[in-house]
């Protein structure tokens, strides 16, 4: 937090609400540079960008299961969609996750096996009611942006898609000189999905790690109720471990929203759905980078990349106009 404040990268004071960071120009530049860098890479890897709303009617959260199983971590409110004379109150929920929006986008179209895999990504801001004692600067906030993506694919495509995601993880982590380790969390006692689905999904995650020559630990019974997952934990410059990337198989949402695709035999099947985040929370990753580099970010990611010392006042306007025209961020 001291590094963030002293370098003018962010405001994590409580006047705007606990866990709701503000970003002045320098901090916003770093966030945008991270997003643009990842966006170019994702386009090259066959992802398509989407934008989804911050709020949904509560019916969406009831269908997804969040209303019953995650409501203590959500923000709900009512608005009058009628008139003063004939009020009609409608409850909405602020999104804690981007998944339902991507699922609704998938459901809005008819899909063939030829369309799969479909890779949708978004830099989506989410809000979670974390306990005030658990909030910690940028590393654990109540409002944060995730580099969320959801891959809709066939059962036979799962391994290849997870391998591709792990390749992306490796590229990102090596760019920032992070060492990292993987952990596969398996089926908990309470879960949905058949034994066959869980076995296939868990084996797919293991096979993907093996094909990527990525060692992993097994965290027995710590998967989500809707599917197994791979967690990527990074080590910073002084050896501290941070949770970042996640690859999650989701049996829940395709079932709840009744997603389908048309097979080569002209029958309907449920797609498999992979949730993945590379940075995780961009704010959290930003905070980890600041800690990792002790505030001295790589040049390409630095909020100010050029500083000019004018010899005379008349040089200021000329220098400013010329460099701004070339989209150069500078201090004069």
Predicted regions and their residues:
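Conserved alpha/beta core surface patches that mediate binding of polyanionic ligands
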Residues: 1, 5-7, 96-151, 155-172, ...
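Single conserved hydrophobic/aromatic residue that forms the stacking wall/gate
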Residues: 2-9, 13, 322-325, 329-332
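Flexible, glycine/charged-enriched surface loops at secondary-structure junctions
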Residues: 5, 48-53, 176-181, 216-219, ...
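Class II aminoacyl-tRNA synthetase-like tRNA-binding/catalytic domains
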Residues: 11-138, 221-223, 229-246, 254
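Conserved alpha/beta enzyme-core scaffolds, especially Rossmann-like or related mixed alpha/beta domains
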Residues: 11-25, 140-196, 220, 300-305, ...
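Short flexible coil/turn linkers enriched for glycine and charged/polar residues
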Residues: 16, 143, 176-178, 224-226, ...
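Metal-assisted phosphate- and nucleotidyl-transfer catalytic regions
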Residues: 79, 83, 174-247
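Generic long, charged, amphipathic alpha-helical segments
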Residues: 296-324, 330
């Amino acid at each position: 937090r001291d590094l963030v404040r002293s370098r003018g990268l962010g405001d994590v004071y409580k006047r705007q609400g606990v866990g709701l960071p503000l970003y002045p120009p320098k901090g916003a530049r770093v966030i945008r540079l991270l997003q643009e860098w990842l966006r170019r890479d994702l386009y090259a890897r066959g992802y398509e960008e989407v934008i989804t709303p911050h709020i949904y009617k509560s019916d969406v959260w009831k269908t997804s299961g969040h209303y019953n199983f995650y409501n203590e971590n959500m923000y709900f409110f009512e608005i009058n969609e009628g008139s003063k004379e004939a009020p009609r109150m409608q409850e909405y929920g602020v999104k804690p996750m981007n998944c339902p929006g991507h699922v609704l986008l998938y459901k809005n179209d008819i899909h063939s096996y030829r369309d799969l895999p479909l890779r949708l990504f978004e830099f989506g801001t989410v809000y979670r009611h974390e306990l005030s004692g658990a909030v910690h600067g940028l590393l654990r906030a109540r409002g944060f942006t995730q580099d969320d993506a959801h891959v809709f694919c066939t059962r036979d495509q799962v391994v290849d898609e997870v391998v591709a995601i792990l390749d992306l993880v490796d590229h990102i982590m090596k760019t920032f000189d992070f060492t990292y380790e993987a952990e596969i969390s398996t089926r908990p006692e309470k879960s949905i999905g058949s034994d066959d689905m869980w076995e296939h999904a868990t084996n797919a995650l293991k096979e993907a790690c093996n094909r990527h020559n990525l060692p992993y630990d097994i965290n027995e019974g710590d998967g989500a109720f809707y599917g197994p997952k791979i967690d990527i934990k990074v080590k910073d410059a002084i050896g501290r471990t941070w949770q970042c990337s996640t690859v999650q198989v989701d049996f829940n949402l395709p079932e709840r929203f009744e997603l389908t695709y048309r097979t080569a035999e002209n029958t309907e099947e449920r797609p498999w759905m992979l949730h993945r985040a590379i940075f995780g929370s961009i704010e959290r990753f930003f905070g980890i980078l600041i800690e990792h580099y002790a505030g001295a970010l790589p040049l390409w990611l630095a909020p100010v990349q050029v500083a000019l010392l004018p010899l005379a006042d008349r040089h200021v306007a000329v220098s400013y106009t010329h460099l701004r025209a070339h989209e150069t961020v500078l201090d004069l």
